[in-house]
């Protein structure tokens, strides 16, 4: 019997920098790093799923939970159906805004395209 399985990313100071897109099969988050001045840049993180994601959402922690978890504010989650005995696959990745991917929009576009490629792989016929 199928059961839910969850993949998630820890959020610190999410402030709108989170995408939970079940329909397109990816979740993303922009982490501000530890330097509040921005000198260290931002880290983009995400997960893409080749199979259908049933639900994707942000879950924020209560103030007490935040203290107990050392600064985490919550999670962005992708919930899928898992059939025991089968494989569960997802792809996790990251980028840095001081390298090739400079903006949150560029990161989200990259992840959306990557998830689309996972879901519709190249088919070669001869």
Model regions: which residues?
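Acidic (Asp/Glu-rich), glycine- and aromatic
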Residues: 2-23
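A short, structured loop/turn motif at beta-sheet edges
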Residues: 2-3, 37-38, 51-54, 81-87
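Generic structural hydrophobic/aromatic packing signal, biased to beta-strands
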Residues: 7-9, 29, 45, 90-92
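Short, flexible loop/turn elements at secondary-structure junctions
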Residues: 9-13, 33, 94-96
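Solvent-exposed beta-strand/loop surfaces of large extracellular or lumenal domains
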Residues: 16-33, 57-65
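A recognition module on extended beta-rich or small alphabeta surfaces enriched in W/G with H and D/E
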Residues: 25-56
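Beta-strand-rich recognition/accessory modules
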Residues: 55-126
